[in-house]
């Protein structure tokens, strides 16, 4: 006897399972089954496809008029941080630049101070609250970066918190050491601080899967970033890079040359960098909510990357300064509106390709897969990025069990 059958599904979304990320035109290929059925036993998928009455189960969910998809993957977050920066919004409205806000004691260094002052347990409670919000919105796989400690004690504190969260909730969660995220005030120079972070790599390897660096004007150069990435690979890390967010420094080209698993942001990436994606499996993780929040007009050139047969994914970039959202459904809508992605491209970018960007087996519904699913209160898969700003996730299913039920009920 099976444990659960989800039947009469209006649309069952079945992203293609591949060893490598979907590239170029492949991203627009999505198997959408009308009147579908999913059968689950022992937390695994037994069957997923067109409607069938050939299976029995102890529990049945009628998904008439609903969409069922794999649980979503958020491939770029800064989940563990102290404090918040809502007061900076008024400064931005007054026309203050990021550097001016930084000089006033705001910006990333204010988050560094707040994170340093927050105990590990309090940091855990805050991150747990934010993680549960992600789960309620359909996410069951997450990447979590450090980068707000900028010293040994506090970088480790951030990584320990994300590891505790993964253990408590048994999530597909990957942890990224982003020690070179900014340069703290106490550092004698960028170069000296970078060497401090490189020296930490063997120790943080016990808590982190990836090593990341912020390659940008005024932070770390291309040469410094390459040095760090090479040292990280020597220490056993797969590497990522925050690249070309503001200036076209060649961060995307560096990521491809160093065989990074992903290059993230890429708003200012050059045509040369986009062309190099053609022969690379590095995933371009695009973060359109960041561009929106910062009030910028130019978004990452998703269409140019796809035209060059590149692989792209989407993520929230959840952080307190430039993308204060942990709702990936909002990102899906922004990507459709501003990156000009089709509904199929959006869905693949938050499932199978996002999973490739953090090196996990997720984002598909195949026989033998973990039964990590979302039942959406939507008539079709195009409706979710179309009707933006609300939570369409009705039920979130983890390992075959309903762990979130957002069904509305009122007492009048």
Curated annotation (Swiss-Prot):
Alphabetical list of SUPFAM superfamilies matching this protein: Composite domain of metallo-dependent hydrolases, Metallo-dependent hydrolases
Q: Pathway, per UniProt? A: Amino-acid degradation; L-histidine degradation into L-glutamate; N-formimidoyl-L-glutamate from L-histidine: step 3/3
Subcellular localization(s) per the UniProt record: Cytoplasm
The cofactor note from the UniProt entry for this protein is: Binds 1 zinc or iron ion per subunit.
Q: Kindly state which keywords UniProt assigns to this record, in alphabetical order.
A: Cytoplasm, Histidine metabolism, Hydrolase, Iron, Metal-binding, Zinc
Q: Which InterPro entries match?
A: Amidohydro-rel, HutI, Metal-dep_hydrolase_composite, Metal_Hydrolase
Amino-acid positions noted as binding N-formimidoyl-L-glutamate in the UniProt annotation, renumbered to this chain: 148, 319, 321
* Reactions catalysed according to its record: 4-imidazolone-5-propanoate + H2O = N-formimidoyl-L-glutamate
Q: Could you say which cofactors this protein requires?
A: Zn(2+); Fe(3+)
Q: Write out the residues that bind Fe(3+).
A: 76, 78, 242, 317
Q: Name the GO cellular-component terms.
A: cytoplasm
Q: Which residues take part in binding 4-imidazolone-5-propanoate?
A: 85, 148, 181, 245, 322
Q: What is its EC number?
A: 3.5.2.7
Instruction: List GO BP terms, alphabetically.
Output: L-histidine catabolic process to glutamate and formamide; L-histidine catabolic process to glutamate and formate
Instruction: Write out the GO MF terms.
Output: imidazolonepropionase activity; iron ion binding; zinc ion binding
Functional description taken from the UniProt entry: Catalyzes the hydrolytic cleavage of the carbon-nitrogen bond in imidazolone-5-propanoate to yield N-formimidoyl-L-glutamate. It is the third step in the universal histidine degradation pathway.
The record's family statement is:
Belongs to the metallo-dependent hydrolases superfamily. HutI family.
Name recorded for this polypeptide = Imidazolonepropionase
Species this protein is from: Staphylococcus aureus (strain MRSA252)
């Amino acid at each position: 006897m099976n444990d659960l059958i989800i039947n009469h599904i209006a649309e069952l979304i079945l992203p293609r399972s591949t060893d490598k990320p979907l590239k170029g035109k492949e991203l627009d290929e999505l198997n959408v089954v009308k009147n579908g059925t999913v059968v689950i036993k022992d937390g695994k998928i037994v069957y997923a496809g067109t409607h069938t009455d050939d299976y029995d189960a102890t529990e049945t969910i009628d998904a008439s008029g609903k969409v069922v998809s794999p649980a979503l993957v958020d491939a770029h977050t800064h989940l563990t941080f102290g404090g918040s920066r809502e007061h900076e919004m008024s400064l931005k409205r007054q026309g203050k630049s990021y550097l001016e806000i930084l000089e006033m004691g705001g910006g990333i260094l204010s988050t560094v101070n707040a994170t340093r002052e927050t105990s590990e347990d309090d940091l855990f409670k805050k991150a747990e609250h934010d993680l549960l919000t992600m789960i309620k919105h359909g996410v069951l796989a997450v990447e979590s970066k450090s980068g707000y400690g900028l010293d040994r004690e506090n970088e480790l504190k951030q990584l320990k918190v994300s590891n505790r969260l993964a253990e408590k909730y048994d999530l597909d969660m990957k942890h990224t050491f982003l020690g070179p995220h900014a340069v703290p005030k106490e550092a004698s120079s960028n170069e000296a601080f970078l060497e401090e972070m490189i020296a930490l790599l063997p120790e943080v390897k016990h808590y982190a899967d990836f090593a990341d660096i912020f390659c940008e004007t005024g932070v770390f150069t291309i040469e410094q970033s390459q040095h760090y990435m090479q040292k990280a690979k020597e220490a056993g890390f797969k590497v990522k890079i925050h690249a070309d967010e503001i200036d076209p420094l060649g961060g995307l080209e560096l990521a491809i040359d160093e065989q990074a698993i992903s290059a993230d942001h890429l708003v200012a990436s050059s045509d040369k960098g986009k062309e190099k994606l053609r022969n690379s499996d590095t995933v371009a993780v695009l973060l359109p909510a960041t561009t929106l929040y910062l009030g910028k007009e130019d978004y990452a050139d998703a269409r140019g990357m796809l035209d060059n047969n590149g692989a792209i994914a989407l993520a929230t970039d959840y952080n307190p300064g430039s993308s204060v959202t942990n709702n990936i459904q909002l990102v899906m809508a922004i990507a459709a509106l501003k990156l000009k992605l089709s509904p199929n491209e959006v869905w693949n970018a938050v499932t199978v390709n996002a999973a490739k960007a953090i090196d996990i087996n997720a984002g598909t519904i195949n026989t033998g897969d973990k039964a990590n699913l979302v039942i959406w209160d939507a008539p079709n898969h195009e409706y979710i990025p179309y009707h933006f700003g609300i939570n369409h996730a009705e039920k979130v299913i983890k390992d075959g069990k309903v762990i979130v039920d957002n069904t509305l009920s009122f007492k009048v």
